[in-house]
Amino acid sequence: MDRQYFLILVVCVGLVANLSGAWGAEGDVPDFSGFWAGMFEPEDQQYRGPGPDFGDFRGLPLSEAGLAKAKSWNPDDDYLPENLSKPHSPTNIMRSSFPFEVIQEPDMITLRMESCEQVRRVHMGGVSHPPAETPHTFMGHSIGHWEGRTLVVHTTHIIENYVRRNGVAHSEEVQLEERYTRDGDYLLLMMTVEDPVYFSAPFMRVIAFRHRPDITDLRPYPCGE
């Protein structure tokens, strides 16, 4: 792991631990409502827009099956009609440069994504995931709960899709844990991805968002499911 990235990760982990443990009682939850947009540095662009170079799998603990899947990728396939409007997986869509809106209710937290006009629904209040044989979708099935002032989201039932736009994919057995913590106008997401098929170990992503009160609605950017 790159030393600079490791140090940033350590700082972020410490921030989340302090924020989630120091604020309020269990029933005192923050309000995530409103529009948010990712905070990215120029060097992040290669991992978001066109994607990193083919063969650049640094930082990802790929299994033999995952490496074979990545090496079989053909970039021309992205331009096939059936793939042009294919939504990103939740493992990737949260890293999009497009903004999103959070609609917060006691029993449901909804994330309206401008990217491909996708909607993520986080079921609160002790809801369980559906049976394993339930059909998978691009956004999967998400359940959530509060740990102090941190929102913890667990997602399953995601259609096989790409983690990076250079062939790295996750299988339909992927499970995603997201931990969202707000500090004023900033929202920190710590994402852990586990996939027993294409990865040999869990891997983590850290993403920061800024509250955007200047945005009043999302622009149409349709994709099909």
Predicted regions mapped to residue ranges:
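Bacterial N-terminal signal peptides
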Residues: I8-N18
